[in-house]
Design a protein with these regions (language model features):
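C-terminal and inter-domain tail/linker signature
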Residues: 1-142
């Protein structure tokens, strides 16, 4: 791993932009042609970040206006890769049976694997989460 590349700092900047609902700031940290995959959408759900995952990033703050992001743990790996445990959420717009009631504030655990190129730009972002809660939020936004 390059000593000059601080992937932890770049990752913190990415999640700070997400917390601030600054999708343009998030995209600025992604390489051209960067790919992402949100695994609960299926193992073959890889898509471009620009025009793909970007839509999801823009959508959650609309469904959950006080949407926020908190990094719980950040682990630097090999080859400019980072694993992140984060809590994402806010005031729930719908009941999530057994998890949270409509109007309550909750954050849903997410796990990210983020890979960077030598220039410090995200080239790949994979994410895992509890899909039951997310499905309820998506349904409420329709």
């Amino acid at each position: 791993m390059s000593n000059a590349l601080d992937v932890k700092a770049i990752t913190k900047k990415f999640f700070a932009a997400y917390d601030a609902h600054d999708v343009e700031g998030m995209l600025a940290l992604c390489a051209d042609g960067a790919q992402g995959r949100y695994l609960p959408y299926g193992k073959n759900s890889a898509m471009p970040i620009r025009g793909g995952l970007e839509k999801i990033w823009r959508g959650f703050p609309q469904a959950v206006p006080d949407f926020g992001v908190e990094i719980v743990e950040l682990i630097e790996g090999e080859d400019n890769a980072v694993t992140v445990q984060a809590l994402l959420g806010g005031t729930m717009p719908a009941d999530v049976p057994g998890v949270v009631n409509k109007g309550e504030i909750d954050r849903i655990a997410h796990a990210y694997i983020i890979r960077y190129n030598a220039d410090g730009k995200i080239t790949r972002l994979d994410c895992y989460w509890d899909n039951t809660a997310i499905t309820a939020i998506k349904a409420s936004a329709l």
